[in-house]
Swiss-Prot record:
Pfam families given in the database record: M20_dimer, Peptidase_M20
Binding-site list for Zn(2+) 2: D101, E136, H353
GO BP: any one term: lysine biosynthetic process via diaminopimelate
Cofactor note: Binds 2 Zn(2+) or Co(2+) ions per subunit.
Keywords for the protein's UniProt record, in alphabetical order: Amino-acid biosynthesis, Cobalt, Diaminopimelate biosynthesis, Hydrolase, Lysine biosynthesis, Metal-binding, Zinc
Cofactor list: Zn(2+); Co(2+)
Gene name tied to this protein: dapE
Protein name (Swiss-Prot/TrEMBL): Succinyl-diaminopimelate desuccinylase
Signal peptide bounds: none
PANTHER family per the UniProt record, alphabetical: ACETYLORNITHINE DEACETYLASE (PTHR43808), N-ACETYL-L-CITRULLINE DEACETYLASE (PTHR43808:SF31)
SUPFAM superfamilies to which the protein is assigned, alphabetical: Bacterial exopeptidase dimerisation domain, Zn-dependent exopeptidases
Length: 391
């Protein structure tokens, strides 16, 4: 059923932050199978659809956390079937926007959960879903707000699986147990514009900005840690609002981002960056404005018993020993970690957000097997049959 669920989910053009029927489809499906569900819409200008659904009323509560929203698909004519929101199956692969990020893992956990409930009437615990349509965008009214809401209603999650596409070369090779932080900067260096023939009557902000960027981009922020790669600064945009060649610009603006590990905080990095900017601007007798905001702090979890148990299930099911990692961008795991231990585990990441995003059907089966086996091991099923995928 995981392939059917995935094909159905791809059919919803759920561009962030819209559900466009995807969450409603899942809500109806889970209600049909005995889940207690609640759909909440948060936000005023951009309304975000969220779902919490739970089966069972005892502990532990194993929760799948995910998002149905997707990024734009680009030119549809570049896709195999000219329609990125109609699932296309070819040579053992399923193509469509959101296939790996992350409708495929949603489909696998749906199938695993419903099959588990059907096959095991004596299990102890609860299975739940927390889904949003606001992860790829601002992420203000999605998982973060829904977690606050369900905890205020008395719900508690004991362990979460976030279904982001984490694997690198084969299903099972990577489990995320943390993420780098992210901080965005906008720097405007303010000079005095004028004619290029009379530089003595102007103060060009660009030489100062170039020196600032040269120092910032050559800083070795750290050497990384056991689970984190080194922190990294990337310049993303430079603008002087000047298309002519004979005018010295008034202002030079740059945007840059730092992805940082747990050796730093957003505050310490902002202070370090501003000290460098201030020194150069004072030397060139220029003013500046600096804006920054952090969308996520870095975090790392010590692999506890439940995280290790999940890794053991992956290894037993797929005969591959997973690596613990913190690589990649930010995810909603940064909100979940404030409430319970978690792992991020899903499909391969290499086609996420790309034209002709796809997954192998065989990879869907592997992911389904891991999810199903974890439920079998965790929810105290007595006299259970051998785990899926094992001989």
């Amino acid at each position: 059923m995981h392939t059917t669920y995935l094909k159905n989910l791809i059919g919803f053009e759920s561009l962030t932050p819209q559900s466009n029927g995807a969450i409603e489809y899942i809500d109806d499906l889970l209600k049909e199978h005995g889940f207690k569900t609640e759909v909440k819409i948060f936000g005023e200008t951009e309304q975000v659809t969220n779902l919490y659904a739970v089966y069972g009323n005892s502990k532990p509560n194993i929760c799948f956390v995910g998002h149905v929203d997707v990024v734009p698909a680009g030119d549809p004519n570049l896709w195999h079937n000219s329609n990125p929101f109609k699932a296309h199956e070819q040579e053992g692969k399923i193509y469509g926007r959101g296939t790996v990020d992350m409708k495929g893992s949603i489909a696998c956990f749906l199938a695993a959960s419903l099959d588990f409930i059907k096959n095991n009437t004596d299990f102890v615990g609860s299975i739940s879903f927390l889904l949003t349509s606001d992860e790829e965008g601002k992420a203000k009214h999605g998982t973060k707000e829904m977690l606050q809401y369900i905890y205020n209603q008395g719900h508690e999650i004991d362990f979460a699986i976030v279904g982001e596409p984490t694997c690198e070369k084969e299903i099972g090779d990577t489990i995320k147990i943390g993420r780098r932080g992210s901080i965005n900067f906008k720097l405007a260096v303010k000079g005095l514009g004028g004619h290029v023939a009379y530089p003595q009557k102007a103060n060009n902000p660009l030489p100062c900005l170039i020196r600032i960027l040269n120092e910032l981009t050559n800083i070795k922020l750290d050497k990384g840690t056991e689970f984190f790669q080194n922190s990294n600064l990337e310049v993303t945009n430079i603008d002087v609002d000047n298309n002519t060649t004979n005018v010295i610009p008034e202002t030079a603006t740059v945007h840059f981002n730092i992805r940082f590990n747990n050796l730093h905080s957003a505050e310490t990095l902002a202070k370090q960056v501003e000290e460098i900017i201030k020194q150069h601007c004072q030397k060139h007798k220029l003013d500046y404005t600096l804006e920054y905001n952090s969308s996520a702090d870095s975090f790392i979890q010590n692999p506890n018993d439940k995280i290790k148990e999940f890794a053991t299930i992956v290894e037993k099911t797929l005969n591959i020993k997973p690596n613990f990692s913190t690589s990649g961008g930010t995810s909603d795991a940064r909100f979940v970690k404030n409430y319970c231990p978690l792992v991020e585990f899903g499909l391969l990441s290499d086609t996420a957000h790309k034209i002709n995003e796809y997954t192998k059907i065989s990879d869907l089966q592997k992911l389904y097997d891991v999810y199903y086996n974890f439920l079998m091991e965790t929810l105290n099923v007595t006299g259970s049959p051998p785990l899926l995928g094992m001989t």
